[in-house]
Amino acid sequence: MAEAEGESLESWLNKATNPSNRQEDWEYIIGFCDQINKELEGPQIAVRLLAHKIQSPQEWEALQALTVLEACMKNCGRRFHNEVGKFRFLNELIKVVSPKYLGDRVSEKVKTKVIELLYSWTMALPEEAKIKDAYHMLKRQGIVQSDPPIPVDRTLIPSPPPRPKNPVFDDEEKSKLLAKLLKSKNPDDLQEANKLIKSMVKEDEARIQKVTKRLHTLEEVNNNVRLLSEMLLHYSQEDSSDGDRELMKELFDQCENKRRTLFKLASETEDNDNSLGDILQASDNLSRVINSYKTIIEGQVINGEVATLTLPDSEGNSQCSNQGTLIDLAELDTTNSLSSVLAPAPTPPSSGIPILPPPPQASGPPRSRSSSQAEATLGPSSTSNALSWLDEELLCLGLADPAPNVPPKESAGNSQWHLLQREQSDLDFFSPRPGTAACGASDAPLLQPSAPSSSSSQAPLPPPFPAPVVPASVPAPSAGSSLFSTGVAPALAPKVEPAVPGHHGLALGNSALHHLDALDQLLEEAKVTSGLVKPTTSPLIPTTTPARPLLPFSTGPGSPLFQPLSFQSQGSPPKGPELSLASIHVPLESIKPSSALPVTAYDKNGFRILFHFAKECPPGRPDVLVVVVSMLNTAPLPVKSIVLQAAVPKSMKVKLQPPSGTELSPFSPIQPPAAITQVMLLANPLKEKVRLRYKLTFALGEQLSTEVGEVDQFPPVEQWGNL
């Protein structure tokens, strides 16, 4: 066997499928399989190489490639199965047997073996639904007349299905206690065991009832969204009847009522529960159809842009999120689904919804959008980038702002940092908006340097960090104290992010300090007139001295003015260690990699995100973990407008430094995959278990995608700084 050192996947495959081989060389075939398992992007690269070899005009080379593919399916595990089970690869196999493509030029031996492999996979891998779809499509078109006989050696042995876990009966402590009681000969212990069994059964029944209620709610939401979406698609102001409008209004009201229900479900669902993704998806679909109704029926403009409408599928997922479609579908119209990357002539998408004209520009400063928002109007399959209601709630709970792009430009109006900050305009708490309590949107912050109001080139202050959510049990303050509904006090804290172009050198000046003093006086008066506190005491904003001089803007967050609003009925937790990461900046070149294995945070459609952990903590902060986020693209399409956001529990803090870029070029077999790096800082002073949720938005080709996920595989906290 040749020297394995330095061998690549391509060299292994070239030797395994060499047309000069007299017989199948299993040394190189197994070496190819082992190399797939070793490499991080092994399955993604391997299927592309195999697709090219399988379509070889030389029969012997193609047959050897199919043998290699069969061996990989048996030896390379689920990661390889997932890549084979995508339409991108299945379309390449269909081209081999379809007369519309290569079927007339390929030998019968090759076509027969392809059909045998597809059929064996449908039997052994029922979870890969796309393989079954591809095989049934070939049968419908008459390419496959009958199911071929499968030899025993070609049959994949499916792994046994995992035993369904019952969180109640799988409780290790209760199981040990129950076993101990049952082994005892004491009648009291047996009676106690009986009580324990009954309590476990009741707990399981309550869990099942909760799951049933959740499924019923999700089904009801998806049905309402689907019906309202279909009616909006066919709505015409001239032709639609009053009955249709009444039905749409009723569906709209039901969707509005279900938004709170979904948020409550999301807050009650465990972080590791797989159904959390379904709840978030249903919430996104709900917000999308509500925005579409307001745009089409009521003529409103949602977040400064016109909402586009997409129909969710039967499972509640939006059609625009499909990974691809099969080719050769008997001339079926596929305009509503994404054309395959490998299809020779993709059909341009069409839509039944008239594209509404953009809203007229206001006389004030124009509302900025990120590059991903600007691409939201590319076609009907693009999802609306308007923040959903659940997104707003999550952002209020501490979702990190997207980091600025590098290199930033000097112009604040054109800088990508400014665009990304204004994309989260709902985080501007200074000016409340009707209908929102914790989150409000405003086009101009309250505090600005004195300047003529007509100037449109004045750069606004950076958006403040999120304010604490005020519980619904607290009575709403009067109109005179509306400042309290949006958490003014924490919003006044200065942001000292070092990488904010256009704002870094902005001084408030004397005028802004007078604004600050006037606002302080207004807060004191509002507390008394609103009836929330007595004139003699101030539980909302504690003060240390009766008469406080004018605060310089450099005053830290510990000063009374910057204390967050709290209520005695809520029970404020004791102040923990310092969480601020504003003054910490870790250059990428100074980071030393650790021996800890990287964690895959996202891996779909050739776009992959990995978390690499640094060996050391920042100086003076042993509670901060440095993570290098690597974004890789192995897809044949470019990935653009990449924005990563992160959120952690309230006892922690997360900060994303500017990424090295926002675009990834398409994959090339002769060059290494394109990559983006971004440094993430995670503060955990209480040394709790880390659970990080992320929101990822990007455009793969022309398709906009929004993904939400969670990562909890972080190194043990006690090992931070010495990984």
Curated annotation (Swiss-Prot):
Record-annotated GAE domain positions: 594-715
Membrane topology reported for the UniProt record: Peripheral membrane protein
Motif (DXXLL): 391-395
GO molecular function, one term: small GTPase binding
Subcellular location: Golgi apparatus, trans-Golgi network membrane; Endosome membrane; Early endosome membrane; Recycling endosome membrane
Residues with Phosphoserine modification: S159, S275
One GO cellular component term noted in the UniProt record for this chain: Golgi apparatus
PANTHER family: ADP-RIBOSYLATION FACTOR-BINDING PROTEIN GGA3, GOLGI-LOCALIZED, GAMMA-ADAPTIN EAR CONTAINING, ARF BINDING PROTEIN
Function field: Plays a role in protein sorting and trafficking between the trans-Golgi network (TGN) and endosomes. Mediates the ARF-dependent recruitment of clathrin to the TGN and binds ubiquitinated proteins and membrane cargo molecules with a cytosolic acidic cluster-dileucine (DXXLL) motif. Mediates export of the GPCR receptor ADRA2B to the cell surface. nvolved in BACE1 transport and sorting as well as regulation of BACE1 protein levels. Regulates retrograde transport of BACE1 from endosomes to the trans-Golgi network via interaction through the VHS motif and dependent of BACE1 phosphorylation.
Protein name: ADP-ribosylation factor-binding protein GGA3
Lineage per the UniProt record: Eukaryota, Metazoa, Chordata, Craniata, Vertebrata
